[in-house]
């Protein structure tokens, strides 16, 4: 929110695997989303036929375009604009390929070429450690020491919106030796092994 408040770019991108996913996880976020952070200074609407949240900031109006990125042709919805901030939820569910003209991820990066204050923020839930999101992006940027790159690993214990009591109830629902516990509770990258 601080970046949107002060940045010089007008148009920004919020993406999820679907538009609904992006709106729920970034726009609303159970009362912690952009529409809560800018309460009284924002309104939902359309921007060139795209779902959007219009923000009224210290530096003028900002438009956050919401897009789904999970399908092979999702990139088409984000063409034609330059974006300052790109915030993506569950980035590992976005469509990616080696073709930079069709990969939602690569097209979104390319749409930031003219940004004055570019910023990329991603979240993801752990998945197969061999998923290309790790090798092609996360680990690649860690290894190249890209200026401004920051990777943070969080577990359920880092989620301040969940009470200690509720957190323990959630943990009790899992077998601590299961892949699901490792993924959902510990935030580890792992894959199920053996017979299903």
Identify the role of each PLM range:
Residues 1-196:
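Phosphate/NTP-binding elements of NTP-utilizing enzymes
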């Amino acid at each position: 929110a601080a970046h949107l408040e002060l940045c010089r770019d007008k148009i920004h991108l919020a993406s999820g695997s679907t538009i609904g996913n992006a709106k729920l996880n970034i726009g609303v976020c159970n009362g912690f989303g952009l529409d809560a952070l800018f309460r009284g200074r924002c309104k939902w609407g359309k921007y060139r036929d795209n779902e959007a949240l219009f923000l009224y900031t210290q530096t003028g109006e900002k438009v956050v375009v919401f897009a789904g990125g999970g399908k092979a042709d999702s990139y088409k919805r984000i063409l034609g604009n330059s974006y300052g901030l790109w915030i993506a939820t569950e980035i590992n569910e976005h469509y990616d390929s080696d073709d930079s003209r069709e990969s939602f991820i690569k097209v979104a990066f390319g749409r930031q070429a003219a940004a004055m204050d570019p910023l990329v923020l991603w979240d993801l839930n752990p998945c197969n450690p061999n998923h290309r999101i790790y090798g092609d992006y996360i680990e690649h940027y860690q290894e190249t020491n890209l200026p401004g790159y920051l990777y943070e690993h969080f577990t359920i214990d880092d989620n301040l919106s969940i009470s200690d009591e509720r957190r323990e109830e959630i943990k009790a629902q899992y077998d601590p030796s299961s892949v699901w516990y490792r993924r959902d509770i510990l935030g580890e990258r792992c894959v199920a092994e053996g017979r299903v």
